[in-house]
């Protein structure tokens, strides 16, 4: 029945749905997991890398995380070629604003500008929506550290912690459970990101080569965007595994004591 309504982007189904937009969202559901967490002293992006070929030159290739300007970065989930077009557009919008007003573009304004383009692709015939969701992290003088998410329909929102991609529902419920508002430091946010990725990624054991993490902080009045080196990610994973093992031991000891009673 739906085939009559899903061949074109602009046709509504009898239930008032745009199937092509929903199919674009479906493409994101199969992409690698990306999550963002807002902390008091910074904000981070963590993403699952799927293309981990050992011959890949990582100097020229970033699968998941892209720097947009001095104050913003983004992570993508979905069709990578679509993501490249959108990240280039984001950089152009940011540079035009800087040239015109001699100051960096506010985070939300950049997100809104891109979402207007995304929305246009759901409204005009002969085009298809971009099969990409983005997480944006940034800092501006108006609202400080910020985290935004946008989807193929052009819809966007500000978040304290969120996830897109594969197993995002499970990741969001974990974040909801473990996110402590007002108490999150970047250090605890990194530990939480590793914990969530460990539970939601479709791998038996989490490895540093499959994870990409970027942090955004402020130092001496300037924004610093850092992509964590593989060794740093390895240390975070190792620390998480040690804590998991410790918690498991304590649980067993507690159960044993209860049995002895």
Swiss-Prot record:
InterPro entries noted in UniProt: Ntn_hydrolases_N (IPR029055), Proteasome_alpha (IPR050115), Proteasome_alpha-type (IPR023332), Proteasome_asu_N (IPR000426), Proteasome_bsu_CS (IPR016050), Proteasome_sua/b (IPR001353)
Primary location: cytoplasm
Region feature (Disordered): 240-261
Residues where Phosphoserine is found: 13, 75, 173
GO annotation terms (biological process): proteasome-mediated ubiquitin-dependent protein catabolic process
Pfam families on file: Proteasome, Proteasome_A_N
SUPFAM superfamilies listed in its UniProt record: N-terminal nucleophile aminohydrolases (Ntn hydrolases) (SSF56235)
Compartments where found: Cytoplasm; Nucleus
Claim: Acetylation is one of the keywords in the record: yes
N6-acetyllysine: residues carrying this PTM: 127, 176
Induction: Down-regulated by antioxidants BO-653 and probucol.
Keywords: Acetylation, Cytoplasm, Host-virus interaction, Nucleus, Phosphoprotein, Proteasome
Single GO cellular component term: cytosol
Protein's UniProt keywords contain Acetylation: yes
Described function: Component of the 20S core proteasome complex involved in the proteolytic degradation of most intracellular proteins. This complex plays numerous essential roles within the cell by associating with different regulatory particles. Associated with two 19S regulatory particles, forms the 26S proteasome and thus participates in the ATP-dependent degradation of ubiquitinated proteins.
Subunit structure as annotated in this protein's UniProt entry: The 26S proteasome consists of a 20S proteasome core and two 19S regulatory subunits. The 20S proteasome core is a barrel-shaped complex made of 28 subunits that are arranged in four stacked rings. The two outer rings are each formed by seven alpha subunits, and the two inner rings are formed by seven beta subunits. The proteolytic activity is exerted by three beta-subunits PSMB5, PSMB6 and PSMB7.
Family statement drawn from the similarity comment of this UniProt entry: Belongs to the peptidase T1A family.
Name of the featured protein: Proteasome subunit alpha type-4
Species whose genome carries this gene: Homo sapiens
Lineage of origin: Eukaryota, Metazoa, Chordata, Craniata, Vertebrata
């Amino acid at each position: 029945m739906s085939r009559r309504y899903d061949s074109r982007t602009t046709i509504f189904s009898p239930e008032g749905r745009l199937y092509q937009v929903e199919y674009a969202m479906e493409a994101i559901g199969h992409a690698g997991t990306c999550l963002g967490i807002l902390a008091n002293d910074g904000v981070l992006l963590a993403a699952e890398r799927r293309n981990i070929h050992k011959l890949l030159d990582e100097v020229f290739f970033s699968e998941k995380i892209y720097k947009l300007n001095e104050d913003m970065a983004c992570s993508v989930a979905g069709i990578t070629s679509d993501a490249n077009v959108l990240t280039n557009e984001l950089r152009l919008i940011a540079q035009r604003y800087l040239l015109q007003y001699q100051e960096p573009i506010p985070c939300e304004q950049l997100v809104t500008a891109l979402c207007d383009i995304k929305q246009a692709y759901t409204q005009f015939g002969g085009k298809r929506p971009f099969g990409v969701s983005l997480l944006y992290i940034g800092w501006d003088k108006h609202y400080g550290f910020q985290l935004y998410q946008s989807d193929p329909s052009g819809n966007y929102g500000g978040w304290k912690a969120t996830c897109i991609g594969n197993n995002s529902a499970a990741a969001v419920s974990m974040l909801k459970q473990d996110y402590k508002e007002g108490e999150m430091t970047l250090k605890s946010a990194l530990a939480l990101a590793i914990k969530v990725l460990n539970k939601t990624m479709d791998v038996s054991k989490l490895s540093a080569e499959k994870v990409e993490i970027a942090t955004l902080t402020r130092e001496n009045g300037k924004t610093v965007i850092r992509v964590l080196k593989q060794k740093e990610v390895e240390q975070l994973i190792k620390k998480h595994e040690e804590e998991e093992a410790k918690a498991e031991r304590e649980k067993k000891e507690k159960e044993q004591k209860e049995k002895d009673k």
